[in-house]
Amino acid sequence: MNPSEMQRKAPPRRRRHRNRAPLTHKMNKMVTSEEQMKLPSTKKAEPPTWAQLKKLTQLATKYLENTKVTQTPESMLLAALMIVSMVVSLPMPAGAAAANYTYWAYVPFPPLIRAVTWMDNPIEVYVNDSVWVPGPTDDHCPAKPEEEGMMINISIGYRYPPICLGRAPGCLMPAVQNWLVEVPTVSPISRFTYHMVSGMSLRPRVNYLQDFSYQRSFKFRPKGKPCPKEIPKESKNTEVLVWEECVANSAVILQNNEFGTIIDWAPRGQFYHNCSGQTQSCPSAQVSPAVDSDLTESLDKHKHKKLQSFYPWEWGEKGISTPRPKIISPVSGPEHPELWRLTVASHHIRIWSGNQTLETRDRKPFYTVDLNSSLTVPLQSCIKPPYMLVVGNIVIKPDSQTITCENCRLLTCIDSTFNWQHRILLVRAREGVWIPVSMDRPWEASPSIHTLTEVLKGVLNRSKRFIFTLIAVIMGLIAVTATAAVAGVALHSSVQSVNFVNDWQKNSTRLWNSQSSIDQKLANQINDLRQTVIWMGDRLMSLEHRFQLQCDWNTSDFSITPQIYNESEHHWDMVRRHLQGREDNLTLDISKLKEQIFEASKAHLNLVPGTEAIAGVADGLANLNPVTWVKTIGSTTIINLILILVCLFCLLLVCRCTQQLRRDSDHRERAMMTMAVLSKRKGGNVGKSKRDQIVTVSV
């Protein structure tokens, strides 16, 4: 094949470009998602610059390095898409969209948590065994086992010291505590028979017998029944431990550092030497299993305890009462007995039985306390929403008032498998937050105002159709009112089912009256009801806020208030601290902001929604009344009389002019008729005399 033939068979380049152009054009128009509706507020996006793409690549690379994910093209693309979606979902800073309207909004129950502090009220903690541990019981926890142990990273702030349990600064340390009941015996060699319970509790930092200002001070002593001076006797049922709250003679200190001072007035029973009546030196040192370094070992391996001395053994700090810690510095808060129910469930409790015997050695009385254990009871403690437990390496920073925890777990229950190498932080859902939100229209209280405003924008420019359009608007408002009335009827129909509720309540009343004891299933339902009441209390507080606020009509999940967001007064860093839960001098002043918002809402509540717009329409209609024009000139009798005379004169003048015009019109009509008659007779007057023609014209 010669070169000329090859050149003739080769396709021309220009034709190839022509075939490729339609394909490129179609590729430019191809989309991978549904076509989105273009709104009036939609703006054309600028193409990304090289600097933006470079920055996005750097952020994606940094994210993959932090998460230890291999950098592949697929992972880089996913990381970039995640960063873009996160940036798009972030709140728009003030000034980014000058055409938008920014107002303060109250968001109830956002997906945020805060730490439970020592100033909060005690929470409900449920145990699965009411025989050995007092308090509400529930053996059907957790409610959602598949969600237990979900991983979470937290970084939240606090105002008052948070409640934390574990071996870490700012947390209450665990320890083993004993509770003992006594049974007197008549045996000559046995003085007493003991039944003792050992379990996990809260460790005191200072020995309660040492002289300490907080211990001997009655300033923080709670009101309650004093602990008995005698050891509680055994109850009728030997398998039940009877708990009775009491106040000891002195307090123990659980924590005293930069995080605050926490004390407990519950009794801390342990054996000590009774040196009363002894002539020789008698050591009054205490002997307590709580000094063991390994907590689990003290409860698992030590199944036999023996105490021997030449001096009689006595049990100090009588009383079967649970710890009730409270904070007294830097602030004074309520007692929190629920913390012990969480701690005691972290390991099984051990049941002891034994006695104290008396024998003679070297011609001296010799006392021996012998305790043996062969029974352990596993426990489980749970909390319910809106409360949760964050378990992990919790770090509390008092300088910045922040709490951080990486790779922590969210739990609602604690059992004997818990490892005290971790810490427990009590958290709860946030009741509500204040954030600025942007809108593409001004704030409006009701849809009627919105409808009326949109219609009046066109009405004011077309005054000829004003009355008809106003009637249409009023008919639209009536339709809205009718819809609300129909909804009220439907609600009334639902309320009529209260008869069924009454019948059900009567049946349940008979059930409660006829039932002698409550089984565990009903007890669980009661606990759920109690927790629901607590949750509903938070909901009612949120509803109270929303009732006090005048909100925009087009939002239902949260409330957009009429208070305009001022960036110079509340910059975004203050809002960010508020979202984190930090409350310091730089944080958003919520109380002051609430006062401003409530004042703005009160100003809008002075008028019924739509009254201002309807009043403007009424004023416009009133201006069309000519009577108002007369009233504006004057209201005296003389002026009114002059005006009446002027009106009569004008009326008379109009009548005279009308009569004159009518006469002129008659003359014109007669002349026209005469001219018409003459034109018809123009050819028929030739044979007549001149006299007859004159007569005809005169006629």
UniProtKB/Swiss-Prot annotation:
The organism's superkingdom is given as Eukaryota
In this chain's numbering, which residues are marked as the site (Cleavage)? 465-466
Q: Can you provide one Gene Ontology molecular function annotated for this UniProt record? A: structural molecule activity
GO CC term (a single one):
plasma membrane
The signal peptide here is 1-89
Q: Where are the transmembrane segments?
A: 633-653
Protein family membership: Belongs to the beta type-B retroviral envelope protein family. HERV class-II K(HML-2) env subfamily.
Extra remark beyond the main annotation? Insertional polymorphism. Provirus present in 29% of tested individuals. Has a type 2 genome. The HERV-K(HML-2) family contains type 1 and type 2 genomes depending on the absence or presence of 292 nucleotides at the 5'-end of the env gene resulting in Env proteins of distinct sizes. Despite their overall retroviral envelope structure HERV-K(HML-2) type 1 envelope proteins lack a predictable signal sequence. Subgenomic RNA transcripts coding for full-length envelope proteins have been detected for both type of genomes.
Ranges in the topological domain labelled Cytoplasmic: 654-699
Stated name of the protein: Endogenous retrovirus group K member 113 Env polyprotein
The record lists the lineage as: Eukaryota, Metazoa, Chordata, Craniata, Vertebrata
User: What residue ranges lie in the Extracellular compartment?
Assistant: 90-632
Any coiled-coil regions, as ranges: none
Its source organism is Homo sapiens
| Modification comment | Specific enzymatic cleavages in vivo yield the mature SU and TM proteins.
Keyword Zinc attached? no
Mark out the compositionally biased spans (Basic residues): 10-20
Task: State the UniProt keywords alphabetically.
Answer: Cell membrane, Cleavage on pair of basic residues, Disulfide bond, ERV, Glycoprotein, Membrane, Signal, Transmembrane, Transmembrane helix, Transposable element, Viral envelope protein, Virion
This protein's record includes keyword Protease = no
Q: What single Pfam family name could you report for this chain, choosing any that match? A: HERV-K_REC
User: Residue ranges of region Disordered?
Assistant: 1-47
Subunit field text: The surface (SU) and transmembrane (TM) proteins form a heterodimer. SU and TM are attached by noncovalent interactions or by a labile interchain disulfide bond.
User: Function, please?
Assistant: Retroviral envelope proteins mediate receptor recognition and membrane fusion during early infection. Endogenous envelope proteins may have kept, lost or modified their original function during evolution. This endogenous envelope protein has lost its original fusogenic properties.
Sugar-bearing residue positions: 100, 128, 153, 274, 355, 372, 461, 507, 554, 566, 585
Which segments carry the region annotation Fusion peptide?
466-486
